[in-house]
């Protein structure tokens, strides 16, 4: 985490993060524009998107910008890692053909019409009326396992209606916690049920999904039917995991590069390869870590190389704490290392983390949340405190404001290199930034008393340079993909 002297400049008016935008104001199938976050149709979550990599030069129409991932330097150029990379490279030779085969189908375009929906990576198109109708039509059944979601800052449970082709809140009438457990399981949570309760409907909804308690032993969403009334006028608020809370109650704001105290950022993990800190990550469940895709590029794509450490502030003390081996590494299937689009990956741990005051999960963002243009966010990590510096021994954290996509894409900053799957954050004066070693770590914000993961540290041009803010993977566009992986690999 790099620091330069100077006060932050003013940022400007409010804007809407379209990754969170309410569905009713979204067009049915928007074009991808360079200066904004994706808008998603009401009837489904966004289909998967691409990823990122080490130290590349991206050509721009004006000056050339050297973009550097925030991992611990170039893995195979550091003298301390040269022998490691040579050994790992030997293991990748036999898999080269398989990787090449994967590359052949990575980049595909949707051919579905506006009245159809796409079945994940298979590219099959089905009518939107068949989505969540109780019969699997997609090759992998995606149309029947993406039928429930949590909405907004209050975690309102919503279910998709295939007849109405829209999402509706679930009425509290006849609801019980057993249904809450079923809904959490449908989303991909494993034995993490936290709580459900009825809360007053403040959205002005005129339609609901209600339980048919006599429908027998079938999937939860098959028990629900569309209704224009809800006698209790209460809707279900569902928490599948206690996330986004800290044990410490700090009153002072972190403005730049302060050493973290125990429990400040309990979702932060350090990801090691053979005893070396390489990247950061964020805890979202006892078994799952969110990190950056460029962290796990070859030769580090195999889970056997990775160890996660949680709840420890100093790198020098990591090996005195508990370590967790990684069981699976799942990089986004459309990861593009050249354009740096959609830099996200997941790690599943062999054994679950034990949550305590020092180890807690952060919340994944829900659809329907809004962010201000200069929304205060926080970054944390063990990255270098200056460009080309060494990894920090102690965990550092700093506040950075969001930057409007159109401003970040101006020719004086990143000149249209920022896609809807990226978020810019920092001070244009260059006072605070993430740096090498921070890659994959969290960009979080506090709303409604809850900490939300809205970005993973991705890339930038240098560290804390003027007009070169940090760039982060836009987690708001990846939540559906994350839930898909949790379901498929539970």
From Swiss-Prot:
It is an enzyme of class 3 (hydrolase). Its EC number is 3.4.21.122. Its main location: membrane. The active site is at residues 294, 343, 439. It is found in: Cell membrane. Keywords: Autocatalytic cleavage, Calcium, Cell membrane, Disulfide bond, Glycoprotein, Hydrolase, Membrane, Metal-binding, Protease, Secreted, Serine protease, Signal-anchor, Transmembrane, Transmembrane helix, Zymogen. Residues 254-487 form the Peptidase S1 domain. The record marks 253-254 as: Cleavage. One of its GO terms (cellular component) is nucleoplasm. PANTHER family: ACROSIN-RELATED (PTHR24252), TRANSMEMBRANE SERINE PROTEASE 2 (PTHR24252:SF30). This is Transmembrane protease serine 2. The gene is Tmprss2.
């Amino acid at each position: 985490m790099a620091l330069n002297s100077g006060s932050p400049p003013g940022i400007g008016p409010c804007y809407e993060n379209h990754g969170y935008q309410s569905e009713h104001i979204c067009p049915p199938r928007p074009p991808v524009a360079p200066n904004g976050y994706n808008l998603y149709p009401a009837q489904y979550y966004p289909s998967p998107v691409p990823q990122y990599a080490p130290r590349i030069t991206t050509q721009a129409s004006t000056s050339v910008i050297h973009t550097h991932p925030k991992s611990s330097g170039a893995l195979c150029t550091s003298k301390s890692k040269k022998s490691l990379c040579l050994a790992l490279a030997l293991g990748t030779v036999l898999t080269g053909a398989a990787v090449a085969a994967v590359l052949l189908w990575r980049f595909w375009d949707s051919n579905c019409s506006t009245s159809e929906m796409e079945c994940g990576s298979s590219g099959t198109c089905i009518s939107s009326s068949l989505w969540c109708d109780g019969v699997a039509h997609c090759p992998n059944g995606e149309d029947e396992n993406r039928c429930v979601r949590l909405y907004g800052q209050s975690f309102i449970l919503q279910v998709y209606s295939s007849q109405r082709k829209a999402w509706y809140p679930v009425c509290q009438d006849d609801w019980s916690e057993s249904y809450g457990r079923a809904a959490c399981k449908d989303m991909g949570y494993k034995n993490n049920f936290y709580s459900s309760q009825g809360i007053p409907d403040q959205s002005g909804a005129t339609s609901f999904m209600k339980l048919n308690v006599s429908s027998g032993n079938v999937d939860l969403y098959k028990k629900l039917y569309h209704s224009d009334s809800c006698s209790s006028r209460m809707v279900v608020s569902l928490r599948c995991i206690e996330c986004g809370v800290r044990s410490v109650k700090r009153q002072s704001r972190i403005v730049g590069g302060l050493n973290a105290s125990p429990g400040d950022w309990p979702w932060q993990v350090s990801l090691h390869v053979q005893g070396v800190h390489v990247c950061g990550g964020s805890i979202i469940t006892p078994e799952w870590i969110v990190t950056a895709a460029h962290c796990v590029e070859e030769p580090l794509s195999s889970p056997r190389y990775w160890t996660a450490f949680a709840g420890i502030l100093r790198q020098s003390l990591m090996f005195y704490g508990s370590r967790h081996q990684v069981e699976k590494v799942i990089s986004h299937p459309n990861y593009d290392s050249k354009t740096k689009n959609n830099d996200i990956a997941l790690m599943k741990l062999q054994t679950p983390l034990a949550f305590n005051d020092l180890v807690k999960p952060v919340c994944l963002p829900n659809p329907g949340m809004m962010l201000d243009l200069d929304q205060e966010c926080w970054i944390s990590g063990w990255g270098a405190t200056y460009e080309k510096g060494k990894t920090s021994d102690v965990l550092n954290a700093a506040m950075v404001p969001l930057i409007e996509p159109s401003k970040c894409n101006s020719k004086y900053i990143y000149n249209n290199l920022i896609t809807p799957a990226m978020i810019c954050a920092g001070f244009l004066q260059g006072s605070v930034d993430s740096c090498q070693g921070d890659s994959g770590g969290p960009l979080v914000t506090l709303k409604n008393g809850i900490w939300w993961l809205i970005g993973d540290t991705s890339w930038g041009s240098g560290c804390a340079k003027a007009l070169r803010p940090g760039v982060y993977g836009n987690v708001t566009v990846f939540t559906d993909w994350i839930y898909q992986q949790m379901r498929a690999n539970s």
